[in-house]
């Protein structure tokens, strides 16, 4: 049995869920998200509780069941609380600047890297070496943060680069001379 798929999703106050031919729309205080779900998965709303049911116990249905429940829960959490990923920059001269919705990064290249915020994503730069990516769609927040990190991933010898806050970067020893 899919343990994740069987968990009940509780709708917080102010969050509404509407479904139409497999397309589910979740509205909340932070915004609105729409996603298409497999038609085999039945979504039942009873008051403030949402449950997902699958037609049979085949392996494929179990995986779709758990994934659908996780996606729906992420939509509910996104429109009620939102998601954020924090990144930090380490290295001499590494810094970030924000101008409107465009993030300019100086990360040791001959040119600055510019990242334009996708729709629904906001950037914050509390200090020149910290970046906060936030929004209501968990997937887009994660993809945007991963793209920013990929512009200069942390290297193992000195640890320079862009990393997630709290990320452990495994360090290596340099070559030993004669």
From Swiss-Prot:
Respond yes or no to whether keyword Lyase is given for this record.
Answer: no
Identify the InterPro entries for this entry: Ribosomal_uL6-like, Ribosomal_uL6-like_a/b-dom_sf, Ribosomal_uL6_a/b-dom, Ribosomal_uL6_bac-type, Ribosomal_uL6_CS
Family matches, as Gene3D superfamilies: Ribosomal protein L6, alpha-beta domain (3.90.930.12)
Q: Name one GO molecular function term.
A: structural constituent of ribosome
Segments forming a coiled coil: none
Q: Does the keyword Ribosomal protein apply?
A: yes
Sorted keywords for this record are: Ribonucleoprotein, Ribosomal protein, RNA-binding, rRNA-binding
- Which PROSITE patterns does the record cross-reference, listed alphabetically? RIBOSOMAL_L6_1
One of the protein's GO biological processes: cytoplasmic translation
Cellular component GO terms held in the UniProt record: cytosolic large ribosomal subunit
User: Which residues does UniProt assign to the signal peptide?
Assistant: none
A Pfam family of this chain: Ribosomal_L6
Matching HAMAP family: Ribosomal_uL6_B
Q: Which family does it belong to?
A: Belongs to the universal ribosomal protein uL6 family.
Q: How does it assemble?
A: Part of the 50S ribosomal subunit.
Q: State its role.
A: This protein binds to the 23S rRNA, and is important in its secondary structure. It is located near the subunit interface in the base of the L7/L12 stalk, and near the tRNA binding site of the peptidyltransferase center.
- The protein depicted here goes by the name Large ribosomal subunit protein uL6
Task: Give the gene name.
Answer: rplF
